[in-house]
């Protein structure tokens, strides 16, 4: 409370005091009356399933729309006598007293947005939610609440986030055009015109087409373009009922320029206005202002490229929806778009035609990517590696694979368990989860198979889809494997394992067999080459061992000590002849196949410990991890030889016989030979 000087006081003297908080306290008390059961409230606003009691004086003071509606009710006695009256979007219920109807039903505003606007009328505070921001702004323009309009303008200037149009619900009808079929009933967007029309006796004489056109014009007029909102001048106060044109369209210029919706157009007539035209007043109104909405779901973008990418997900373009892709407008110093010369030529950005896959319906931007995608359905792999023959569906992946042969593709991420290298850390993590861990959280619902990663499960699910039966044996296979399967019936096995003499129809199956059952990759046996019948000894003796006199090759020790070869008729076939070289060392004298010698020439990665050559770095890393690191113990120092093999040599042989001869030779040969070598200094010479 403060004292102010008042010149109107006479010479007798008077004092004038002003309470600055009086208006705030008055609004607070009125708000408490409204919330406490609607005490002393003289109007009930029904929005959807909710009711909002309020004071006419507060609504009329905040909203020029309510001021016009209540003024029309005061000037007409029809609603006061209890007769039914429909105010377009606001329906007056019977039972009103002197001063108009006590109930007003709002059809065009959701209860959530109207509650925020009503709270602002009593508290001068409003919560702006981005998901309902377009609806709030349109409702503020419709209700002619200038303060809320200025707040929305400020939000647009300061906010750069995407504004989402609210979803299609029964209680959100402000962003739906008249006659929308998904709601089940036509929407009346005039919101105040019909009551005044009924009061003047105009609505009864209008034809249905005129009523639809008037309702459409009012709906378009109440929803002008969103981003740039012009200042709203106060409506002139009238003592009597307002004219129907004034109540129907608060923005007469916009309403007169907007064409009415027509159900069917003939030749030469303008096209039917679509959803965005009815929402934003004129075709392309938002796009000219710098905001680009999607024509299907209503999502708003500020970048034309993002809008095109989003529309491609729907399978349509802006051109197909009836909108021309305009370049983003230039903004002036005040943040408003600069109007360009209307007489200048309008440029259309070239839009690519969207193409879709006929099988799965996926959308692609051109035919090249569509044809590349079709290979995933046919299983065709037209590109093959010139080095190893591995086939690929895409040329870029084949080129990347070819670089792995000459070492240009680095694999810095090494698995600590098996030594395999990877070019990316996520590939290493997927390898560890799938191979070296026992957790399988992702399960197949069809066959109950479990997998470590979701990608493995997704690849496995393809095995249960689109299987076709073989015409010969009736086995169900995917189309990608049917060609290889038919070779079994027509040609028979053409690729033979050089160790176990087992035949396979394709080289890829042979590679899997050799890696699974024999431990390391072996040279391919051509279609016209005789299979090796000596148990693969030629392959195992390809490398020269510098053993001293009296010693044998490691594979001979393993063969002679193994009971799995006792049933052979001639054990001499498994023994390899030896001859002494000039320096006194012994080496295996077994003929090496020609293709083996050729394959050795391709091995460019030598082992720094034993001098063995390998075809790739991954095989070299596996060899070092299995043979040298485990045998020597790595960082364990002198305890390495003791911990390299947890069992005795005899226990190792009996334990590992079931895993195959090659695993014994590659993984545990050094653990059986090195202890003898290490004991040489402990002989009579050392003692």
Swiss-Prot record:
Residues 41-130 form the BTB domain. GO terms for molecular function: chromatin binding; RNA polymerase II cis-regulatory region sequence-specific DNA binding; ubiquitin protein ligase binding; zinc ion binding. Widely expressed at high levels during embryogenesis, especially in the central nervous system, especially to the actively proliferating neuroblasts in the periventricular neocortical neuroepithelium, in the telencephalic cortical plate and in the hippocampus. Also expressed in a stage-specific manner in the mouse germinal epithelium. While strongly expressed during brain development,m its expression turns down in adult brain. It is found in: Nucleus. Disruption phenotype: Mutant mice mostly die in utero or soon after birth likely because of developmental defects in the cardiac outflow tract and/or neural tube closure. Few mice that reach the adult life, equally distributed between males and females, show a dwarf phenotype likely due to defects in cell proliferation. Deletion gene also results in disruption of the testis cytoarchitecture and block of spermatogenesis. The keyword Metal-binding applies. PROSITE patterns: BTB (PS50097), HMGI_Y (PS00354), ZINC_FINGER_C2H2_1 (PS00028), ZINC_FINGER_C2H2_2 (PS50157). Residues 250-279, 332-351, 564-587 are annotated as: Disordered. Residues 250-260 have a biased composition (Polar residues). Keywords: Metal-binding, Nucleus, Repeat, Zinc, Zinc-finger. It comes from the Eukaryota. SMART domains: BTB, ZnF_C2H2. It holds the Pfam family zf-C2H2_6. A zinc finger (C2H2-type) spans 292-314, 355-377, 383-405, 413-436, 442-464, 495-517, 605-628. Transcriptional regulator that plays a role in many biological processes such as embryogenesis, senescence, T-cell development or neurogenesis. Interacts with the TP53 protein to control genes that are important in proliferation and in the DNA-damage response. Mechanistically, the interaction inhibits the DNA binding and transcriptional activity of TP53/p53. Part of the transcriptional network modulating regulatory T-cell development and controls the generation of the regulatory T-cell pool under homeostatic conditions. Homodimer. Interacts with RNF4. Interacts (via C-terminus) with TP53; this interaction inhibits TP53 ability to activate transcription. This is POZ (BTB) and AT hook-containing zinc finger 1. The gene is Patz1.
């Amino acid at each position: 409370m403060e004292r102010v000087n008042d010149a109107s006081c006479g010479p007798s003297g008077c004092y004038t005091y002003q309470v600055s908080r009086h208006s705030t306290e008055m609004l607070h008390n009125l708000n408490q009356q409204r919330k406490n059961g609607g005490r002393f409230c003289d109007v009930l606003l029904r929005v959807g399933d909710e009711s909002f009691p309020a004071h006419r004086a507060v609504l009329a003071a905040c909203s020029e729309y309510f001021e016009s509606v209540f003024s029309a009710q005061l000037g007409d006695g029809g609603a006061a006598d209890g007769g039914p009256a429909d105010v377009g979007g606001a329906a007056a219920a019977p039972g009103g007293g002197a001063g108009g109807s006590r109930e007003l039903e709002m059809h065009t505003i959701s209860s959530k947005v109207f509650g925020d606007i009503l709270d602002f009328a009593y508290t001068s505070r409003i919560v702006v939610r981005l998901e309902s921001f377009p609806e709030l702004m349109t409702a503020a323009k419709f209700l002619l609440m200038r303060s809320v309009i200025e707040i929305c303008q400020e939000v647009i200037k300061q906010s750069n986030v995407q504004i989402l149009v609210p979803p299609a619900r029964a209680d959100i009808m402000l962003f739906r055009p008249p006659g929308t079929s998904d709601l089940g009933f036509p929407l009346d967007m005039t919101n105040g015109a019909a009551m005044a029309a009924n009061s003047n006796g105009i609505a009864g004489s209008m034809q249905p087409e005129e009523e639809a056109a008037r309702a459409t014009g009012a709906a378009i007029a109440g929803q002008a373009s969103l981003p740039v909102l012009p200042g709203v001048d106060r409506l002139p106060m009238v003592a009597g009922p307002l004219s129907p044109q004034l109540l129907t369209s608060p923005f007469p210029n916009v309403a007169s320029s907007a064409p009415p919706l027509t159900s069917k157009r003939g030749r030469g007539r303008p096209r039917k206005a679509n959803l965005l035209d009815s929402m934003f007043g004129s075709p392309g109104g938002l796009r000219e202002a710098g905001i680009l909405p999607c024509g299907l779901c209503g999502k708003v973008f500020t970048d034309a490229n993002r809008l095109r990418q989003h529309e491609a997900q729907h399978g349509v373009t802006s051109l197909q929806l009836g909108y021309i892709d305009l370049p983003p407008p230039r903004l002036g110093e005040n943040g408003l778009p600069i109007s360009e010369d209307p007489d200048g030529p309008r440029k259309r950005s070239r839009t690519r035609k969207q193409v879709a896959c006929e099988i799965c319906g996926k959308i692609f931007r051109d035919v090249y990517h569509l044809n590349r995608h079709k290979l995933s359905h046919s299983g065709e792999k037209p590109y093959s590696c010139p080095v190893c023959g591995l086939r690929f569906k895409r040329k870029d992946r084949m080129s990347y694979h070819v670089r792995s042969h000459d070492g240009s593709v680095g694999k810095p991420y090494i698995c600590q368990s098996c030594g395999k290298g990877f070019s990316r850390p996520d590939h290493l993590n997927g390898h560890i989860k799938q191979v070296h861990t026992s957790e399988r959280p992702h399960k197949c619902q069809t066959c109950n198979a479990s997998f470590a990663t979701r990608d493995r499960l997704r690849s496995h699910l393809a095995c249960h889809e689109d299987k076709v039966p073989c015409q010969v044996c009736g086995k169900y296979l995917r189309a990608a494997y049917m060609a290889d399967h038919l070779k079994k019936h027509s040609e028979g096995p053409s690729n033979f394992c050089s160790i176990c003499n087992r035949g396979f129809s394709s080289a890829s199956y042979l590679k899997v067999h050799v890696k699974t059952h024999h431990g390391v990759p072996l040279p391919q046996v051509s279609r016209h080459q005789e299979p090796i019948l000596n148990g693969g000894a030629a392959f195992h003796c390809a490398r020269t061992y510098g053993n001293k006199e009296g010693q044998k090759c490691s594979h001979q020790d393993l063969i002679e000590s193994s009971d799995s070869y006792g049933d052979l008729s001639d054990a001499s076939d498994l023994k390899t002849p030896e001859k002494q070289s000039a320096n006194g060392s012994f080496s295996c004298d077994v003929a090496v196949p020609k293709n083996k010698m050729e394959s050795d020439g391709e091995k460019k990665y030598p082992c720094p410990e034993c001098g063995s050559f390998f075809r790739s770095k991954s095989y070299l890393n596996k060899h070092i991890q299995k043979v040298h690191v485990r045998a020597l113990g790595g960082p364990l120092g002198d305890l390495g030889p003791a911990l390299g093999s947890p069992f005795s040599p005899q226990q190792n042989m009996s334990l590992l016989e079931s895993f195959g001869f090659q695993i014994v030779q590659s993984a545990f040969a050094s653990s059986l030979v090195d202890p003898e070598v290490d004991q040489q200094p402990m002989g009579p010479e050392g003692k």
